[in-house]
A protein has these predicted regions:
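N-terminal membrane-anchoring alpha-helices
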Residues: 1-38
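Active-site metal-binding loops of divalent metal-dependent hydrolases
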Residues: 48-52, 80-82, 116-118, 147, ...
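Beta-strand-turn-beta hairpins that frame and shape the catalytic cleft
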Residues: 32-45, 141, 148-157, 177-179, ...
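Binuclear metal-dependent hydrolase catalytic cores centered on His/Asp/Glu-rich metal-binding motifs
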Residues: 122-141, 147-148, 152-196, 257
């Protein structure tokens, strides 16, 4: 019994104190049809779900941001969920100001979208989202909400969150020239199953799931906050040619992780002028870093 208690205590300590800050830096290619040669070989870093608030230490996020900045990324994208509300239901504004001051900047662009938590209680508080956008923009992010922006010939489209009151739906891509090289940011991957894509068949970068945060080895996580349980983590191909990459999140909404480490994704952009297939998960390489 004593050995079982020690083993259980050790596993609990690991899941509570070690793995939530044991960041995996995943390096992989991102092949975009028609990507301008000017951007070929450039780096694009995806950060997601930092959840500034009671469950993620400021010091951990700041150290992680400094490590990302040391990579000198060309483009940084953030795919939603800046915060977790405090126990009194208010956004952690002072914490956000401290942490976002260190948010890594891309040499060409730093772009963000909102997640469901950025809309406050029950994902319905527009005033919270407005505050989050202001703080993010003050920190150097260009926030896109059912809009697109151009980065050296690459069109980056950002959806507002699926669960929030301002989800753009089919109108977003109807107003976009999909013949241009395009990358879509969409916090909740469940949006992939909605009839809103207007023939788009490129890459989507998502977050939201945290990879489930906890799972037994070789098994799926028991709890994932999406309807479509395919959308857990990593690269998922869709039948119509779209591909989504679901980031496992840098933070968490409850401080526990087991066998699902936090993630920062470092993509190297490449052009698909010849229509060659996108690379598979087998081509992914990663570097593990304990931020401590």
């Amino acid at each position: 019994m004593g050995a079982l208690f020690v083993a259980g205590s050790g596993a609990g300590f690991y899941a509570w104190q070690i793995e939530p800050e044991w960041v995996e830096f995943v390096r992989r290619p991102l092949v975009i049809r028609g990507l301008p040669q000017l951007l070929a070989g450039c780096s694009l870093v995806q950060i997601s779900d930092i959840h500034i608030g009671p469950d993620v230490a400021n010091s951990y996020l700041i150290r992680s941001f400094k490590r990302i900045a040391a990579e000198q990324p060309d483009i940084v994208v953030f795919t939603g969920d800046f915060l977790t509300l405090r126990s009194d239901g208010r956004p952690p504004i002072d914490q956000m100001k401290v942490v976002l001051r260190h948010f890594p900047q891309g040499k060409l662009a730093t772009i963000g979208i909102l997640g469901n938590h950025d809309y406050g209680i029950r994902w319905k508080e527009d005033r919270v989202a407005t505050t989050v956008v202001k703080l993010a923009e003050d920190a150097g992010l260009k926030m896109i909400r059912n809009q697109s922006c151009q980065v050296n010939g690459l069109q980056i489209v950002g959806f507002d969150d699926l669960l929030g009151p301002n989800f753009g739906g089919p109108q977003v891509l109807k107003n976009i020239d999909l013949h241009e090289p395009t990358l879509v940011l969409c916090h909740n991957p469940d949006a992939l199953d909605f009839p809103i894509w207007n023939g788009y068949n490129g890459w989507i970068l998502s977050g939201h799931t945290h990879g489930g945060q906890c799972k037994a080895p070789f098994l799926r996580p028991p709890i994932v906050p999406v309807h479509n349980k395919r959308y857990i983590a990593g690269e998922i191909p869709l039948a119509d040619g779209r591909r989504v990459y679901v980031n496992r999140a840098l933070g968490q909404s409850m401080r526990v992780r087991f066998n699902v480490r936090p993630e920062v994704t470092l993509f190297q952009l490449a052009s698909d002028l010849a229509g060659t297939p996108s690379p598979s998960v087998a081509e992914v390489s990663s570097k593990s870093i304990l931020i401590g």
